[in-house]
Amino acid sequence: MREEVERKIKEVLGVKEETLKYEGVFRRRKRKGAKEYEYLEAKFYDIEEKKIVNVHVPVKKENLVLELDRHWKESKKREKELEKRLKEIISEYKNPDLIREILERLLEEGIRREAKDYAYEKYKKEALELFERFKPYLIKLRRERLKRINLLQALYLLANVKEMFQEKEEELEKVMERAVKTILFRDQNQKLQSPLGVLKNDFFLPKETPYDFLLSRFLQAELEPVLEKLLKAEIEKEETQEAMGEIAEFLTELSEEAKSRVLKVFPSFSQFSKVLYREWKKSGQSLKDFLVDWKSFLEFKGKEAEKEVLNVLSKLNL
């Protein structure tokens, strides 16, 4: 694993010499005139020349090299832990055959764990990128009560549909809208034992696709909760914007007398909108019913009406 990461770092930096062995990255400082600036260098050791070779890391490649360096350090740490464990085994057991069997099993487990860690990081990054690309469709699916199909499965379906129709840009948006409706239709059909399997047939998906990794169990176990949290935040943000828009429209429709009452207590309608939104979230009512009640209250007529309305508004403005 460490050798693979080293190879990738050398590839990114254009280092072709086989004799150079990677040893890490370091921040350097350099003064140019009156200014001092930082830059990143990768350190290599030339095993033939027996000397250190420093390679400058271009700014646009810094993030990638730093991420690869993190994987390299983690692999190096695991190798040291493995080496320590091997020494303990050799000192503890005297039977050569038993030691060989233990070492083979330990090495196999170490390789399996590293492969899993690397695959998870790679697929996690790709899945998050897909999440950003298809976020509007995922929001629509979840707001329409998608339940049986999880987010990674929905991403798998949406990404494959878009892949099939990417050359037909003029039709793509309509195709994606139909795909969303089809996913919801199958998801809500309780008679289907496996809506995902039916949807694969609906979309004529081949047995193998570029997005099969989204269906892997280990990725779903680790990443699904993360995506759920991200999507929940996006939906709350969208719903807040919609509610604030309705409240703003509601305020424009108030009578002049009601508007006057509001502005006697609050510095602006914007401030009052935020208070109304807060009170609505606590009320448990639908926004429509909540605003109907407030309209009646703000436009309340009667001898003591203005005094009572201003008193309530003042308490809310505390």
From Swiss-Prot:
It comes from the Bacteria. Keywords: Plasmid. To A.aeolicus AA07 and AA34. This is Uncharacterized protein aq_aa11. It comes from Aquifex aeolicus (strain VF5). The lineage of its organism: Bacteria, Pseudomonadati, Aquificota, Aquificia, Aquificales.
